[in-house]
Amino acid sequence: MSTTTGQVIRCKAAVAWEAGKPLVMEEVDVAPPQKMEVRLKILYTSLCHTDVYFWEAKGQNPVFPRILGHEAAGIVESVGEGVTELAPGDHVLPVFTGECKDCAHCKSEESNMCSLLRINTDRGVMINDGQSRFSINGKPIYHFVGTSTFSEYTVVHVGCVAKINPLAPLDKVCVLSCGISTGLGATLNVAKPTKGSSVAIFGLGAVGLAAAEGARIAGASRIIGVDLNASRFEQAKKFGVTEFVNPKDYSKPVQEVIAEMTDGGVDRSVECTGHIDAMISAFECVHDGWGVAVLVGVPHKEAVFKTHPMNFLNERTLKGTFFGNYKPRSDIPSVVEKYMNKELELEKFITHTLPFAEINKAFDLMLKGEGLRCIITMED
């Protein structure tokens, strides 16, 4: 048994004290895990755009002071009452959404949207008792999406922890706990392109490139990348993208351009930007009779999707997805195995590595649009 089991652990954490201000490295107290919770030692975390979005807090409920971070990998330090599936020393990925295994969603093979542990960006406390497990001088520091991985130790509900192969390199597979799995699963689990098919990917950021990687793994023969930034195409080739379309280069709607390129439309499309015009284009560019469009990007809350009903009546299908339709505990371990079996390449997503003390540099890189994923090493 760990000497820290049942004890408060004092450790370093990068605290967001207020919106848009640099994170501050603080000494925080991390309470022991309560019923159905685990305390994790975080070894590697990466920065996702969602962290930046809620750090800026321009359009959402500001919850501060807070410990952000949700893409990470670590080791179980201790477990709370009732936890039987995990033990100290297990290698794990904390996930921003969960799988209680008891609700109707968890019991359905068609859903990964757990009723109990579905992502909640406003909640800054644990669901067990409505309290935070983090504090500084007795004052609570709030959690973020149930994970808060910008801390050397964190407490997470057991349903939000995926136990993985202990041989998997944590500094690589940490990126699978959010964006990469979201894009990959959108293609493999929802769009389901067949070998030799054509796929259009809208948005060539990390999630879009993960969707392209899924199309490459599925054996698509044409992978058309759509982005307003022409400089992204060279990098996209590494992920299987064969052609590039910049909507700014054409006077006609991009869906018409793609339809002309592909003799009536692509077999599948995956939209990863969240811009409503791109969503409409992604749907209208798929072939009638069998085309499937999948929406991944999160739109503005006032956005309205408009298309003519004949696009549906002509047998086009529109689908949405959340976290690539992966159930965190049941499915993410198998995604790690795809990497271990060399089916999935993760190294090309990782463009920067920084020590924990320089975490604010990772925010700067993302705000400048430089790189894809920056791995933050927690131990010096």
Curated annotation (Swiss-Prot):
NAD(+) binds at residues 50, 203-208, 227, 232, 273, 296-298, 323, 373. It is an enzyme of class 1 (oxidoreductase). Its main location: cytoplasm. One of its GO terms (molecular function) is alcohol dehydrogenase (NAD+) activity. The keyword Magnesium does not apply. It catalyses: a primary alcohol + NAD(+) = an aldehyde + NADH + H(+); a secondary alcohol + NAD(+) = a ketone + NADH + H(+). PROSITE patterns: ADH_ZINC (PS00059). GO terms for cellular component: cytosol. Zn(2+) 1 binds at C48, T50, H70, C178. Zn(2+) 2 binds at C100, C103, C106, C114. It is found in: Cytoplasm. Its EC number is 1.1.1.1. One of its GO terms (biological process) is alkaloid metabolic process. Binds 2 Zn(2+) ions per subunit. Belongs to the zinc-containing alcohol dehydrogenase family. This is Alcohol dehydrogenase 2. It comes from Solanum tuberosum. The gene is ADH2.
